[in-house]
Amino acid sequence: MRKLPRPFYERDTILVAKELLGKYLVHHDGLEEKIGRIVEVEAYLGQHDLACHSSKGLTKRTKVMFGPAGYAYVYLIYGMYYCMNVVTEKEGIGSAVLIRALEPIKNIQDRTQGPGLLSKAMRIDSKLNHRDLLSNDFYIAEPNSPTDFTIIEKPRIGVHYAKEWANELLRFYIKDNPYISKT
């Protein structure tokens, strides 16, 4: 496996989102190394995207989204689930890609269909917020033998409040993969 370099993340968010599909999310938490293949993501395009956390501006919570690229943005939802995002583009944009689902590859026994479930299975929590994804214990890597697949584009899940942004085709997943989240 080859860790993704910083310039990978510094590009257009939609391009990064699509190219994250098939990559490996790796977390070594001191107990064991867990690896999951990214099979579903959502793109959040910065301050003009009403579904994006950064649309409310720079806050203590969203500061990491404004850069630099290649850092993890991890936050708690419903008081019980962590969601993991990858910060993208140049500093100041406030864009990120939400990792929605993983296919278990190594040391994952729990369900990974959905952002909260995958974070629980991978032991991702608030301690990993603002973590550099070029670190040695938490990163995304190119698999040794990439596979071909078809990418499906759909509207993001759970963003009905975002007006015209609710129907944008910014959710991407690997066609026919059994590990995508349920809608």
UniProtKB/Swiss-Prot annotation:
Gene Ontology molecular function: alkylbase DNA N-glycosylase activity; DNA binding
Record bears the keyword Hydrolase: yes
Pfam families tied to this protein: Pur_DNA_glyco
Class of the enzyme per the UniProt entry, highest EC level: hydrolase
EC number(s) on file: 3.2.2.-
Family: Belongs to the DNA glycosylase MPG family.
Protein name (Swiss-Prot/TrEMBL): Putative 3-methyladenine DNA glycosylase
